[in-house]
Amino acid sequence: MKKILKTIIIGILTVSIATGCVRFSKEDKETNAPKESSYKVFSEWIGKKGIDSIKISAMKNNIKIYYHDNETVLIQGRYKGNYKYFIENNLLNITAFAEELGDNNLNVYLPNKVYKNISLENRDATSKIFVNVENLIISSNDEVVVEEAEIGNLKIATDNKKVQIIKDTINKAIIETKNNTKIIVDQTKVNSMNLTTESGDIFAKIKGNKQDYQINYSKNTDDSKDKQITAVSGKGKIEISFI
């Protein structure tokens, strides 16, 4: 009898290992992952319509926010760790913490429209935004990229890695970085932009006429024009040009 019971238990364990079944999702949803990988892979559609604001709290996850050709939100991820979301009114709140540094990613695909607010706090991994939003706030200690987006108000605070603003249209931007963090603004149209770094370089290529802008190299400057570019670095190089 003991021998038969032992054979049954071994058989159950063998099937469990072979299927590679893991549990992972907004609370605890079952999904499958290759047995040779410690990463958990998931893909989840958010059925609620009318979401106009996104809040993401993440750690050790490379975050990307895109548009896609669908009227619902899609969340896809690949990492080992915890993930959940909840919706309050029209706010989608996502939490995604990976257990260790690595090739971790969390991608959020959104219906194509202008969003009211996107707030992203991400530690130890990159953050990349490719959607239009009225108010965008990013707090990080790693690389930040905002590319080909229309932004009403942009605020970025980060350490250590570079910030890249590429081919965007922005009304007002405040970008503050610590340490030797480089700020790059490339082919971007902006009305007001304040760039501050402790010791990194600042390179800004602005779409517009130089004569329309007041350019400041210190914070304490009286405004004489509606359009302002302020660039301040404690030790780094500053280059501002117009195209």
Q: What spans do the regions from the language model cover?
A:
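Intrinsically disordered, low-complexity terminal regions
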Residues: 1-243
